[in-house]
Amino acid sequence: MEKLLSLLNASDDIVFNVNIFLEDDTVMLTNAKFTVYDYYDEDDHICLVQDNGASLVLPKDGCVYFEDEEGDNWRFKQGDLEVYIYEE
Protein backbone atom coordinates (compact mmCIF):
# COMPACT_ATOMS: atom_id res chain seq x y z
CA MET A 1 0.00 0.00 0.00
CA GLU A 2 2.87 2.38 0.76
CA LYS A 3 4.21 1.93 -2.78
CA LEU A 4 0.81 2.76 -4.24
CA LEU A 5 0.53 5.88 -2.08
CA SER A 6 4.03 7.03 -3.05
CA LEU A 7 3.11 6.53 -6.71
CA LEU A 8 -0.04 8.62 -6.25
CA ASN A 9 1.92 11.34 -4.46
CA ALA A 10 4.63 11.46 -7.12
CA SER A 11 2.55 12.48 -10.12
CA ASP A 12 -0.64 14.17 -11.21
CA ASP A 13 -3.34 12.34 -13.15
CA ILE A 14 -1.78 8.89 -13.01
CA VAL A 15 -3.48 6.28 -15.22
CA PHE A 16 -4.19 2.73 -14.05
CA ASN A 17 -5.71 -0.21 -15.82
CA VAL A 18 -8.45 -1.68 -13.64
CA ASN A 19 -9.90 -5.19 -13.71
CA ILE A 20 -12.78 -6.20 -11.43
CA PHE A 21 -13.88 -9.81 -10.93
CA LEU A 22 -16.23 -11.73 -8.70
CA GLU A 23 -14.95 -14.79 -6.84
CA ASP A 24 -16.67 -17.07 -9.39
CA ASP A 25 -14.58 -15.37 -12.13
CA THR A 26 -17.48 -13.30 -13.41
CA VAL A 27 -15.90 -10.31 -15.14
CA MET A 28 -17.34 -7.01 -13.96
CA LEU A 29 -14.81 -4.73 -15.66
CA THR A 30 -11.69 -5.48 -17.64
CA ASN A 31 -8.77 -3.31 -18.78
CA ALA A 32 -10.63 -0.09 -17.99
CA LYS A 33 -8.52 3.04 -18.00
CA PHE A 34 -8.83 4.88 -14.69
CA THR A 35 -7.21 8.31 -14.48
CA VAL A 36 -6.71 9.26 -10.84
CA TYR A 37 -7.47 12.95 -10.37
CA ASP A 38 -7.46 12.83 -6.57
CA TYR A 39 -7.40 10.30 -3.76
CA TYR A 40 -8.33 10.00 -0.10
CA ASP A 41 -6.22 7.94 2.28
CA GLU A 42 -8.48 6.74 5.11
CA ASP A 43 -7.69 4.38 8.00
CA ASP A 44 -9.11 1.23 6.41
CA HIS A 45 -9.41 2.11 2.72
CA ILE A 46 -8.14 4.33 -0.04
CA CYS A 47 -10.52 6.07 -2.42
CA LEU A 48 -9.32 6.87 -5.95
CA VAL A 49 -11.30 9.63 -7.68
CA GLN A 50 -11.50 10.21 -11.44
CA ASP A 51 -11.89 13.68 -12.91
CA ASN A 52 -15.51 12.86 -13.79
CA GLY A 53 -16.25 12.26 -10.10
CA ALA A 54 -16.44 8.46 -10.26
CA SER A 55 -14.51 6.76 -7.48
CA LEU A 56 -13.02 3.38 -6.66
CA VAL A 57 -12.80 2.34 -3.00
CA LEU A 58 -10.03 -0.14 -2.20
CA PRO A 59 -9.79 -1.87 1.21
CA LYS A 60 -6.32 -1.69 2.76
CA ASP A 61 -6.67 -4.96 4.66
CA GLY A 62 -7.37 -6.83 1.44
CA CYS A 63 -4.40 -5.43 -0.46
CA VAL A 64 -1.73 -7.67 -1.97
CA TYR A 65 1.13 -6.11 -3.94
CA PHE A 66 3.04 -8.15 -6.50
CA GLU A 67 5.30 -7.67 -9.50
CA ASP A 68 5.19 -9.51 -12.80
CA GLU A 69 6.20 -8.94 -16.40
CA GLU A 70 3.63 -6.14 -16.66
CA GLY A 71 5.18 -4.23 -13.78
CA ASP A 72 3.58 -3.12 -10.54
CA ASN A 73 0.28 -4.76 -9.68
CA TRP A 74 -2.11 -4.60 -6.74
CA ARG A 75 -4.94 -6.93 -5.84
CA PHE A 76 -7.66 -5.78 -3.47
CA LYS A 77 -10.15 -8.32 -2.16
CA GLN A 78 -13.29 -7.64 -0.17
CA GLY A 79 -15.93 -10.32 0.18
CA ASP A 80 -16.34 -11.98 -3.20
CA LEU A 81 -15.11 -8.93 -5.12
CA GLU A 82 -11.53 -8.70 -6.39
CA VAL A 83 -10.01 -5.59 -7.94
CA TYR A 84 -6.70 -5.69 -9.82
CA ILE A 85 -4.98 -2.46 -10.74
CA TYR A 86 -1.70 -1.87 -12.50
CA GLU A 87 0.07 1.18 -13.79
CA GLU A 88 -0.41 1.81 -17.50
Tell me what each language-model feature is.
Residues 1-12:
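N-terminal helix-cap/turn-to-beta initiation motif at the start of protein domains
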Residues 22-24, 51-53, 78-81:
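Glycine-centered tight beta-turn/hairpin loop motif at sheet-sheet or coil-to-beta transitions
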Residues 14, 76, 84-85:
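Generic preference for hydrophobic/aromatic residues in regular secondary structure cores
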Residues 25, 69-77:
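Short, exposed beta-strand-loop hairpins at the edges of beta-sheets
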Residues 26-50:
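Amphipathic, interaction-prone secondary-structure segments
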Residues 12-21:
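A short, Trp-centered hydrophobic/proline-enriched beta-strand micro-motif
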